[in-house]
Amino acid sequence: METSTLHKLKRKAGSLFESQLLQSGRVLEVRHWEPSTMIEIDLHLPQADIQNWHEIPYIKVRVDDLTYRDYTPAGWDAETNTCTLYIDAAHSGPGSKWAKHLQKDDIVRYLKIRSTRHAPASTPAIIGLGDESSMGHMLALQQMVLPATRFSGAIVMADENHRGLFGQYFKSPLMPIERNDVYGHHSLIQWVMEQQYNLEHSVFYLAGNHTMVGELRKLLKLQGYPSSQIRVQGFWS
């Protein structure tokens, strides 16, 4: 009984905390890729200061009671205060469950929007490397790179249909490549080696599952790229 009462008090305190601090947005559209483990969500965020997104941002979204997940918006438009989330729902968890149940006109609540500290370096070649969970991050990076000819990269994707849809949906120099290993780092380093990037003038931006990001960083260093030319952002274990 005592434990149950304490739990109720914590939930009540948490609800008060959330009601004071949370901001809200509205779902404009939800698109489920086939198979529906990739979910594309268009949002209107009237309170977001989108015109000052000079580094790749992340949104700390409320996905359940006192439960939050960080998602990277892409395709943002400061005039309309809109953006799109790309959520990899292939694994179980509160974020995936939340995304799968979203519908048009639902209200989305979020705690804050902050920077990932990823912004394009002033170098001739910006290379983005990621997986399904970092699709939004890679597309956001592409959006920020000017001129666009400086940008290239690859996203490792397990599902063949998703790779085909990516090529259809986006005008992007990002290549969707087949996942031939569990975490994806071996597939990505093989792709990098085939591109023969310039050792001195290439900066890599890595984002995705922690194992892939960590191992890919090691493999790039073995290829001769220094730490100063490798920027990392790990999302999940």
Model-identified regions with their sequence ranges:
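Extended, composition-driven regions rather than compact fold-specific motifs
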Residues: 1-237
